[in-house]
């Protein structure tokens, strides 16, 4: 993985090349074949991923109760992401060791990922507080943006549900 490519990811915004290299040294390259789920909803997470090449689909289980007493195992595609937008995912595992993945991630095409273990990322942030501050600020921006998007989606769903109930 190229250092200039890594610098394009929002998590490394405002970090210089030497600062990003500290993370690069701890990253593992992973190749995922087309069609493979490589994060499974409900599993315990211990790493974050950067999508270097390919396309992924993030899914969540609907898990609706059926009249027969069983579960509906269908999944809802939340978003498709391409490497050209430099996505990062799995970041919630940084903040809670027992945090379970809240979605599944599937490779739509063959993918190349950079995996960074949560413990390694946090150790770098502890050892180099200036770098840690920048990375955590960047993560906060990422999470805030996602929270705003989630709130907008909840409002849309609530509005649609209210309109259906009014009929």
Residue ranges, per PLM feature:
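Cyclic nucleotide-binding regulatory module and flanking cytosolic helices
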Residues: 1-29, 33-34
């Amino acid at each position: 993985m190229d250092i200039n490519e890594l610098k394009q990811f929002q998590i490394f915004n405002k970090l210089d090349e030497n600062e990003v290299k500290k993370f690069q040294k701890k990253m593992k390259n992973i190749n995922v074949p087309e069609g493979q789920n490589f994060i499974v909803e409900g599993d315990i997470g211990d790493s974050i991923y950067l999508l270097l090449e390919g396309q992924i689909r993030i899914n969540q289980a609907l898990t609706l109760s059926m009249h027969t007493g069983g579960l509906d195992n269908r999944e809802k595609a939340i978003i498709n992401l391409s490497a050209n937008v430099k996505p990062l995912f799995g970041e919630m595992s940084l903040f809670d060791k027992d945090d379970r993945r809240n979605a599944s991630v599937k490779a739509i095409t063959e993918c190349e990922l950079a995996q960074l273990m949560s413990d390694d990322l946090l150790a770098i942030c502890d050892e180099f507080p200036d770098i840690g501050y920048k990375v955590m600020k960047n993560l906060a921006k990422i999470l805030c943006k996602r929270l705003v998007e989630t709130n907008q989606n909840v409002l849309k769903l609530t509005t649609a549900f209210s309109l259906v109930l009014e009929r």
